[in-house]
Amino acid sequence: MDSKSSIVLEIGGRYTKCGYSPESSPRFIIPTNLLPLNISSYLSGGASFDNFKKEITSDNETITTTNQIPTKLPTQSQLKESLFIFFKTIFLNYLLCKSDERKIIIVENIFLPRLFRESMVSVLFEQYRVPLIVFINPTASLIPTLRTTALLIDSGFSETRVLPIYEGVGILKAYKSISLGSESLINQLKQYLQSNITNGIIIDNQNNQSITDSMICNQLLNDKILNSIQLLEDIITRCCFCSFKNKNNNNIEINNINYRISKEYSILIDGNNIRKGLVDVLYKDVNNNDNNNNNKEDDDENLEEGNIATTILNTLLKCEHDQRKPLSHNILLLGGTTMLAGFKKRLVLELHRQLKMNENSIYRNELFGLIGHFQFINHPFENNYLSWLGGSILANALEHVHSKITLESYLNAPSQFKRSQLIPEWEKLTNINNYTQIAQATMGTTINPLQFNSTSSLFSPFTSSSDLSSHLNKD
């Protein structure tokens, strides 16, 4: 059993990465299908979810929302039933393996709800009889980059999380999150399509003419577009990008394009409102009162106010003064939303804009010196599976990882309460100096994370944080 590769899972609110260690990328990236539950926001941080769809209709540019059902949390029995089917699909349909022969490495969100973790452990041990479960927090994403200091910006489906890591230690007091992600882009795209569906955005592919028949347009909208999140995601991925002004401080005009949704019809994607303007929802302006407020504690009262840039700056405000510049030099992007074209440059421009916007703002008073120091950690891997790769590397040195549970210890626990105590809490996973030691040991023996690409593209010009380049294999 020890000779078999471990299974590495990263369960996200929208997609799940699954594969084997010590491979450099997941075998499959599949939708997190926990039907009949729809709990993407719940998986992000324990937020309530609505198990019923909200039907949105459009009538002469008037959008109304019907069927408002109070939100509720899932029960443990519901989670176990959905997780059993979900893991069965992973083991039998994708990874093609026996669950009782493979150790499971779970790369988890640091604030994954405990009820979900308990249900997941119960299903894997009691029904699938896996021999070992190891919990790895997202700070393992530093290991493929050979760094010990980074400002983690994880922008996923339903929220963006910012966590600073300084010399291997997570600064949890500075952790911030905001409900902005690819779901925000999808909702914005839906609103645009609903309000403009009869304004000639549906194109007939045969004669390349706009269709104004409201019955045909609404039928296409409800049957083919709004009910397909994959199609909306594909529109955003293929057509949209993060825009910025040119050197003359003028907006760049973007051409409209046609997106083919079927053999007969296409959608006219507006260049200004959608292609370059859709991403603006991630950087929506905050109230001036928030910018003029010099009380740092007010940032904790309402995390929903602001945008991605202000969330990052609020995180830096919570860090010590000598930590801010090293963190700014080592920004590490995670999540699929950060893979949009132009995301890095737009993020830096928005950070600079917030620092220059108001002379009396707390950002300008305390963080103005960071202008010109926002740099990203360069690496040859994709942002959406970097955390998974960190778990894949750590799977080769499980004897050094303490956040693990064996099947024997779980089944021998005298009560359900004792079993739940075996599951590690997030506050016990904050110090990742252990991960650094594992990386040093691992890179000199079994796996080099750079063996899949050249080392020249890995390190940023700033080396204000420790790197582990001396531990690379020399041969």
Curated annotation (Swiss-Prot):
Record-given protein name: Actin-related protein 10
Pfam families per the UniProt record, alphabetical: Actin
Localization per Swiss-Prot or TrEMBL: Cytoplasm, Cytoskeleton
InterPro entries in UniProt: Actin, ATPase_NBD
Principal location class: cytoplasm
GO annotation terms (biological process): microtubule-based movement
Any GO CC annotation of this UniProt entry: dynactin complex
Family: Belongs to the actin family.
Keyword Glycoprotein on entry: no
Domain of life: Eukaryota
SUPFAM superfamilies with a match to the protein in the record: Actin-like ATPase domain (SSF53067)
Source species of the chain: Dictyostelium discoideum (Social amoeba)
UniProt keyword terms in alphabetical order: Cytoplasm, Cytoskeleton
